[in-house]
Every structure is written in structure tokens, then in C-alpha cells.
Design a protein with these regions (language model features):
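Extracellular cysteine-rich, disulfide-stabilized repeat modules
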Residues: 13-22, 31-33
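Extracellular adhesion/carbohydrate-recognition regions
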Residues: 34-100, 144-146, 155-159, 175-181
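Small-residue (G/S/T/A) turn/hinge positions that recur once per unit in extracellular repeat modules
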Residues: 1-3
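An exposed tryptophan-centered "aromatic clamp" motif
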Residues: 84-99, 105-169, 181-183
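Tandem-repeat/low-complexity and Cys-motif detector
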Residues: 5-10
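Extracellular carbohydrate recognition
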Residues: 170-174
Length: 184
């Protein structure tokens, strides 16, 4: 041991550094499970890597460096204008209208890059997976169109076909899917 202490405050001046075991990180004077892609955000603001009974999951972490999370609610068959309204007005237990938005193209790219991990978390939470893994769209198969918040110079809305990661744009009146996102 590098110090003999009767309580933590007595040790603070004696211990120069300490580390956590793998899968955990420091949080003040203790440790918590490390936040990772696919971790769950609960309505009380806590984050966990496992499903916790009697807690409500409201989001899944998409990217830790940009602190991006996506809703568990994937809204279907909205045109581009409806998608914007849906995302701006979206609420969950513990969040309010205006705290969510439609994803940018960069956000959709992060979702696509981490789709396998996110699908595992969605599936474990009892939610449909991204891109029709559980429900094949009759028109798009498993290459669903997900709207972004971005428009082109020609008035079309930018989107990503999540099956293959194709970036494209479509008439704003066409149907598609949207995923509200927020920073955590």
C-alpha cells in the first residue's frame, strides 16, 4: 500500500494517483461504469451499460466524443417537414420539448458507423432495430431513408439510406424515418 489511512480525506494528501479496473472510470472519489457507445440514458439522467429494472430508458449513446445520444423512438413515415416538427416537439420522461432535434448528416454518419452496437442496445431494450432489421419496409427493404435536419440548395432534404450508408437528398414531401437526437 502506498498510504495508511483511517478515512478517505486522510488519504487524499498521501495518494498521488489511482486507477479503476477495466470498464470503469473515475467519478470524484469513486468509480462508475465507463460510458460507451450503446450505453443507456435513463429518465433520471443516469447512464448505464445494462438495463436497470424500474428505470425508464430514454436514449442510447451514439458517440462519446461528441456526446451524441439518440432516442429509442424511431418515427416512421414522416415527410421532411413533419420530421422537423416531430423532432423539435419530441419529449420523453425527464426531457422537454426543444431539447431534441433531427440529426445532422454527421449525426447520421455516426449512427451508421455504430449501427451494429446501437442495434444490439435497441434489441436488448425491446425496441425495433435500425433500418428494418425487425420490420422490412415494403418499398425500401432494409435500406430505409432517414431524414437529416439539412436542406440542399434546391430545396430537397438530405438523408441517409442506413442499410448501405448512402448519402442522398429527396423531395421534402416524400416519406421517410427520423430519429430524434440530443447531447447528453
Amino acid at each position: 500500500a502506498n498510504a495508511t489511512c483511517s478515512y478517505f480525506a486522510d488519504c487524499a494528501a498521501k495518494i498521488q494517483s489511482w486507477t479503476c479496473k477495466s470498464g470503469y472510470e473515475k467519478s470524484g472519489n469513486s468509480y462508475i461504469a465507463a460510458v460507451k457507445i450503446g450505453s443507456y440514458i435513463y429518465s433520471d439522467g443516469s447512464i448505464g451499460n445494462e438495463i436497470i429494472a424500474n428505470k425508464t430508458i430514454i436514449a442510447i449513446i451514439v458517440d462519446t466524443s461528441s456526446r451524441l445520444a439518440m432516442s429509442l423512438e424511431i418515427e416512421t413515415v414522416k415527410d421532411g417537414t413533419e420530421a422537423d416538427t416531430f423532432c423539435k416537439n419530441f419529449t420523453t420522461q425527464g426531457t422537454s420539448s426543444g431539447s431534441w432535434s433531427c440529426p445532422t448528416m454527421n449525426d447520421l454518419q455516426l449512427i451508421y458507423n455504430n449501427k451494429s452496437i446501437l442495434n444490439n442496445s435497441l434489441h436488448n431494450a425491446g425496441r425495433p432495430r435500425l433500418n428494418g432489421e425487425d420490420n422490412i419496409d415494403p418499398v425500401y427493404g432494409n435500406n430505409w431513408r432517414y431524414w437529416s435536419s439539412e436542406m440542399t440548395n434546391y430545396g430537397n432534404r438530405r438523408a441517409m439510406l442506413l442499410g448501405k450508408g448512402n448519402i442522398t437528398s429527396f423531395n421534402n414531401s416524400w416519406p421517410g424515418y427520423t430519429i430524434p437526437v440530443r447531447k447528453y
